[in-house]
Amino acid sequence: MAGAKEIRSKIASIKSTQKITSAMEKVAVSKMRKAQMRMAASRPYAERIRQVIGHLANANPEYRHPFMIDREVKRVGYVVVSSDRGLCGGLNTNLFKALVKDMAVNRENGVEIDLCVVGSKGAAFFRNFGGNVVAAISHLGEEPSINDLIGSVKVMLDAYLDGRIDRLSVVSNKFINTMTQQPTVEQLIPLVATPDQELKHHWDYLYEPDAKELLDGLMVRYVESQVYQAVVENNAAEQAARMIAMKNATDNAGDLISDLQLIYNKARQAAITQEISEIVGGAAAV
């Protein structure tokens, strides 16, 4: 029964692992719901800033903020939002594939690249892959704060204002639904014009201080809020991916336990049959 003992030990080990993955799945569900709430709460802020920027720009067409001016692209910047932990399926791998593909297009056109990396997995990836990482931050926790991101974002904004980069994009996972997380590369600055029905209406605003100074401040806040939104949404996507990965692991463990249990029963039956045969054979010899 040596083989049966090994199988029994393996079954016990897999059951122990199954309990862990099942618990991690439940924790991921709880964290995902909280992340979804933070995601929903932060979205209106960024959208309202975008609307006010549009009103200000329309009301003051003579002033063009640097973040609204297109220029020849010689160097680009990426804010790469990854997770701090693994066990979330192919979430980070798919994100890095999308980023590398976009970077390859820029390099083919002779465009140089600077990187701002959010998350430990992104930092580890670029240590191996290579890349000019000019800013990095990690271990933001389950409830990231926009204040934690301001320093790293400022590095990229200053680079844009100084002319060291000509375009800035954010790379993150979009939370489509519980089963779908989509890696995306979105341009932050120069600001991409989007059709907004509200801008067609007349808004009688009084700006204090003047509209130019207000626009300068709002532009920075807008970029910061977009990066924060990407971090919060990526966190929700991470928890959803981890929930799915742990559920699959739990289900696979159950299948493996069933297969091993069948093998164990067959081995035990064979051992019992052999013992009976030996007893019968011994009795016949007597």
UniProtKB/Swiss-Prot annotation:
InterPro entries: ATP_synth_F1_ATPase_gsu (IPR035968), ATP_synth_F1_gsu (IPR000131), ATP_synth_F1_gsu_CS (IPR023632). One of its GO terms (molecular function) is ATP binding. It holds the Pfam family ATP-synt. Its main location: membrane. It is found in: Cell inner membrane. GO terms for cellular component: plasma membrane; proton-transporting ATP synthase complex. One of its GO terms (biological process) is proton motive force-driven plasma membrane ATP synthesis. It comes from the Bacteria. F-type ATPases have 2 components, CF(1) - the catalytic core - and CF(0) - the membrane proton channel. CF(1) has five subunits: alpha(3), beta(3), gamma(1), delta(1), epsilon(1). CF(0) has three main subunits: a, b and c. Belongs to the ATPase gamma chain family. Produces ATP from ADP in the presence of a proton gradient across the membrane. The gamma chain is believed to be important in regulating ATPase activity and the flow of protons through the CF(0) complex. This is ATP synthase gamma chain. It comes from Pseudomonas fluorescens (strain Pf0-1). The lineage of its organism: Bacteria, Pseudomonadati, Pseudomonadota, Gammaproteobacteria, Pseudomonadales.
